[in-house]
């Protein structure tokens, strides 16, 4: 009986400490990366503005090639919606909110695992010279308490790095 009592006190103590730590961690997150690609701004932007192409280069598609994807609307235009379901990388939805071809920018809202809270994401292509472009891919969002504790263990930046490296390989072939 004493063992059970000490065991329960220990478990409750660990849970309490974990929740206390989470209370002091940031509830916002920022992730992203950038890369230079040896292609013109126009070529790169025409490829990245199409959300259906993301499955060719994003790292999450490589983690789970069996992702179930659904698309609604006209790809590369505001309102286009991509939803996915995956046992390995989770479920979510991505909606194009703005496309600015002149500035090489596409803005998107990301919703993870049924959340109603939009995480803001964008891809931006900038011309370095007529044959080299810089691509930025970033996301900013919120993680509710106590799930913000996961921020200590997950680094999405490496997934953005890998995705942009895959994009570079595809476009520079």
Tell where the protein language model's regions lie, with residue ranges.
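Sec-exported extracytoplasmic/periplasmic mature domains
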Residues: 49-56, 101, 165-172
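Short beta-edge strand/loop motif at the mouth of beta-sheet-based domains
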Residues: 52-93
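Beta-strand/loop substructures that line and gate deep hydrophobic ligand-binding cavities in soluble
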Residues: 109-162, 167-169
């Amino acid at each position: 009986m004493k063992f059970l009592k000490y065991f329960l006190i220990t478990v409750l103590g660990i849970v309490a400490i974990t929740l206390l730590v989470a209370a002091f961690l940031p509830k916002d997150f920022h992730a992203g990366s950038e890369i230079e690609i040896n292609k013109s701004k126009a070529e790169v932007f025409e490829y990245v503005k199409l959300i259906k192409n993301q499955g060719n280069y994003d790292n999450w598609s490589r983690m789970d090639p069996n992702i179930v994807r659904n698309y609604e609307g006209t790809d590369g235009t505001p309102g286009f919606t991509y939803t996915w379901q995956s046992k390995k990388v989770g479920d979510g939805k991505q909606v194009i909110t703005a496309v600015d071809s002149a500035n090489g920018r596409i803005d998107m809202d990301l919703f993870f695992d049924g959340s109603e809270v939009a995480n803001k994401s964008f891809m931006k292509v900038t011309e370095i010279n007529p044959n080299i472009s810089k691509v930025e891919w970033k996301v900013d969002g919120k993680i509710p308490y106590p799930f913000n504790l996961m921020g200590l263990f997950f680094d999405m930046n490496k997934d953005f790095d890998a995705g942009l490296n895959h994009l570079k390989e595809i476009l520079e072939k």
